[in-house]
Amino acid sequence: MEYPRIGNIQLDGFALLAPMAGVSDLAYRVIARKMGAALTTAEMVSAKGLYYHNEKTKDMLKIAEEEHPVSLQLFGSDPAVMALGAKVMEKAGADIVDINMGCPMQKVVKNGDGSASVSYTHLRAHET
C-alpha cells in the first residue's frame, strides 16, 4: 500500500491532524504523532503577528524534532505579509506551509482573512 505524498513529503500513514485553534499546540501535536498521525498541523498563525514580531505568535511556531513531518498554517490577506510569514515558517522548520482560506470565525473574517480571503484573486494567483 502506498501512502500519500504532499509535494516532496512522503507520509508514513493516512491519519492527518487538522489544525485546531487553541488545541493543536506543540504538546498535542507530539502526542498525535506518537499515536499514529502521519502529519500534524499547528493551529493557524497570524501573518501580521509574525510581521510585527509578536512573541506569542512566534511561540506558536515551535516544532519538536520528533513530530516531522509538520505543517504550519498561516492566515492573512496581504500578499507581502503572507510571503514574509511563509518564509518565517519555513525558517522555523515547517515541512509544509498551509494557507488558511476556510476559517469562518467572525474575528478572523472581519479582517478579510480566513474564508473571506477566498474571493481575493490576488492571493490565489500563486497557488501551487
Describe each PLM feature range.
Residues M44, G49-L50, M101-V118:
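Glycine-rich, proline-tolerant flexible connector loops at the mouths of alpha/beta enzymes
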Residues L17:
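An anion-binding catalytic pocket shared by soluble metabolic enzymes
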Residues E2-R5, M20-D95:
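Glycine-rich, positively charged N-terminal anion/phosphate-binding segment
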Residues T121-T128:
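Conserved small/polar residues in nucleotide/adenosyl-binding loops
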Residues D12-G13, A37:
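Conserved catalytic motifs of the protein kinase core domain
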Residues D12, E67-P69, G112:
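Short, solvent-exposed beta-strand edge segments and adjacent coil->beta transition regions
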